[in-house]
Structures are given as C-alpha cells and as structure tokens.
Swiss-Prot record:
Protein name, entry field: Ribosome-recycling factor
GO annotations of cellular component type: cytosol
InterPro entries from the UniProt entry: Ribosome_recyc_fac, Ribosome_recyc_fac_dom, RRF_sf
Organism for this UniProt entry: Ralstonia nicotianae (strain ATCC BAA-1114 / GMI1000) (Ralstonia solanacearum)
Chief localisation class: cytoplasm
Keywords: Cytoplasm, Protein biosynthesis
Stated family: Belongs to the RRF family.
GO aspect biological process, one term: cytoplasmic translational termination
Gene: frr
Cited function: Responsible for the release of ribosomes from messenger RNA at the termination of protein biosynthesis. May increase the efficiency of translation by recycling ribosomes from one round of translation to another.
GO MF term list: ribosomal large subunit binding
Pfam family, one: RRF
SUPFAM superfamilies per the UniProt record, alphabetical: Ribosome recycling factor, RRF (SSF55194)
Location in the cell: Cytoplasm
Length: 186
C-alpha cells in the first residue's frame, strides 16, 4: 500500500462520514416542509417494513405541508400510522386518498434544542473524520516500520491527510452553521 492509496482511502472514508452527517441533518425538522423528513419512515407493507417512498408519492402541498399519496387505497391508514409513530412530532391528516402532513411551527425552546442536537451531531462527524486521520497515520507508521516508505514520505503523507482532515472539518462546521441558521429562521 502506498502513500497515495492511504490518502485516497482516507479521503473516501472522510467523505462517507460527511455524507452520513448530511443524512442525519436531513432528519432534523425545521419549520419548513421537505420530503426528506419522511425518508427514514418505515411502513408495514403486508408484513414487511419498507421505506415510505416505496409505497407512496411524496410531494409538497405548500411551504408547511407535505402531501403523501399511497399507491394503494388500503395502505392509507398504514402509511398514516407509520408517519405518526415515526417520532417526528408530526400529526398527519387523511383527506380521502391523500395524507396531508402539516409542519407545526417550532417553539423557541424547541429551536434551541434542535441547534444543540445539530452541534452534537456535528461534533460526532468531526470525531469520525479525525478517527480516519488517526487510522491513516497508523498505516503510515506501519509502512515506515516495515521500511516500505521513508520518514519523509510518512511526514508528507501525514501532512496531506491533515489537510484533508482540515477541509472536511471545515465542511462540517459550514453545514452546522447553515442548519443552525435554517432552524433559527422563523
């Protein structure tokens, strides 16, 4: 394994950490409606749990309402129950074959709680990125010990991985700041 391989592997792992963090951020409810909020909702479809997107069309009725239209009439109550049980603080209402999910406005207290959650998840993402850096540095040390690379190459590799770490940590900070702003905007 070369310095370039370790760097490439570290970059891919760091990107996966950022992608996972972005997915976590999408689940944090702001005052605005977006279909991504329901992405992780699982519906009981004839005995097996499937994502809501596989049994219904998701759309936006307006800025504060998600509309969910199950493909089968008999799935309406199961989809509504799944949304209610998803622990998102949402109260869906069925109108014929369409389920409307209004976004209740967030209280100031709830907004502050959500910003704490976002910051905590941001710290977790930074820790994940730093763990990748630590693993890469350990691989460099092992290569030096095995005399596969020189100490200069090790230092160069560690510097490059540190630059990657700085870049990804800055991206996490940027995402946290954007989400905080989105949450605190009334």
């Amino acid at each position: 394994m070369s310095v370039a391989d370790i760097k490439k592997s570290a970059e891919q792992k760091m990107q996966k950490s950022i992608d996972a963090f972005k997915a976590d951020l999408a689940k944090v409810r702001t005052g605005r409606a977006h279909t991504g909020l329901l992405d992780h909702v699982q519906v009981d479809y004839y005995g097996s749990m499937v994502p809501i997107s596989q049994v219904a069309n998701l759309g936006l009725a307006d800025a504060r309402t998600i509309s969910v239209q199950p493909w089968e009439k008999k799935m309406v109550s199961a989809v509504e129950r799944a949304i209610r049980d998803a622990d998102l603080g949402l109260n869906p209402a069925t109108m014929g074959e369409v389920i409307r999910v209004p976004m209740p406005p967030l209280t100031e207290e709830r907004r502050k709680e959500l910003t704490k959650v976002v910051k905590s998840e941001g710290e977790d993402a930074k820790v994940a990125v730093r763990n990748v850096r630590r693993d890469a540095n350990e691989q460099f040390k092992k290569l030096v010990k095995d005399k596969a690379i020189s100490e200069d190459d090790e230092r160069r590799g560690q510097d490059e991985v540190q630059k990657l770490t700085d870049r990804f940590v800055a991206e996490v900070d940027k995402l946290v700041a954007e989400k905080d702003k989105e949450i605190m905007t009334v």
